[in-house]
A protein has these predicted regions:
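Structural motif
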Residues: 5-6, 34, 57, 126
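Glycine-rich phosphate/diphosphate-binding loop of Rossmann-like nucleotide-binding domains
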Residues: 20-101
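Glycine/serine-rich phosphate-binding loop and adjoining beta1-alpha1 elements at the start
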Residues: 1-27, 160-163
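Adenosine-phosphate binding glycine-rich loop
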Residues: 128-130, 134-189
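Short glycine/serine/threonine-rich phosphate/pyrophosphate-binding segments
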Residues: 12, 39-43, 64, 106-110, ...
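Short, solvent-exposed amphipathic alpha-helical segments in soluble enzyme
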Residues: 48-49, 72, 115-118, 139-141, ...
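Rossmann-like adenosine-cofactor binding region
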Residues: 81-154
Length: 189
């Protein structure tokens, strides 16, 4: 079988799972995402829905405003916190518990940003090469933790979900009349 999937969504799910396990509680954590494209914006929404204080930096501030306004409009009404947009990456990340680089292939976390982070801040690279060499060197000198999320667990759960759905559609679809009510299984109506 060939299964259709969206790699960016697996990356978002892997990052969210990693953060929820590593931090234990996301509620109240200040998480800064540098890069608000497909991955960064989807992750921001999941994190704010979990109670995190999310701030975003995007190089193109006009697009950043559109993204943040859209995310704040579609998040659940009862979600108290709002996603904040910053025009300066250092200002956005200076008090973060977690700094996430979600840029597509170009370094967005440099030495100046790392120097201004809290020493306990976790640094997460969601793409490839989101940190400059000097940023890695300084973070290492400061004994800061740098992580790159692994999509393996997200891929495994995704494949399991697909196979389970396939099984439901093959064997469980249907309707049964019990006389006093109808029972409809998952699948077709």
């Amino acid at each position: 079988h060939v299964f259709e999937f969206k790699p960016n969504d697996l990356t978002v799910n892997a990052a969210w799972s990693f953060l929820s396990q590593r931090l234990i509680y996301l509620n109240g954590k200040k998480i800064c995402i540098l890069g608000a494209g497909n991955i960064g914006s989807k992750l921001a929404l999941k994190l704010v829905e979990s109670g995190a204080e999310v701030c975003i930096y995007r190089r193109n501030i006009n697009r950043g405003n559109i993204v943040v306004n859209g995310l704040n409009l579609i998040k659940p009404e009862r979600t108290i916190t709002k996603i904040q947009l910053y025009s300066d990456a250092i200002q956005a990340s200076s008090m973060a518990d977690v700094l996430i680089g979600a840029s597509s292939g170009s370094p967005i976390i440099d030495a100046n940003i790392v120097k201004n982070l809290r020493k306990e801040c976790l640094i997460v690279d969601l793409g490839k090469n989101n940190l400059t060499g000097n940023a890695i060197k300084i973070a290492t000198e400061y004994s800061m933790n740098i992580y790159r999320t692994d999509v393996t667990p997200a891929m495994e759960s995704f494949v399991y979900e697909l196979l389970k759905t396939q099984d439901i559609l093959k064997r469980s679809c249907g309707k049964k009349d019990l006389g006093f009510c109808n029972i409809v299984s998952g699948g077709y109506f």
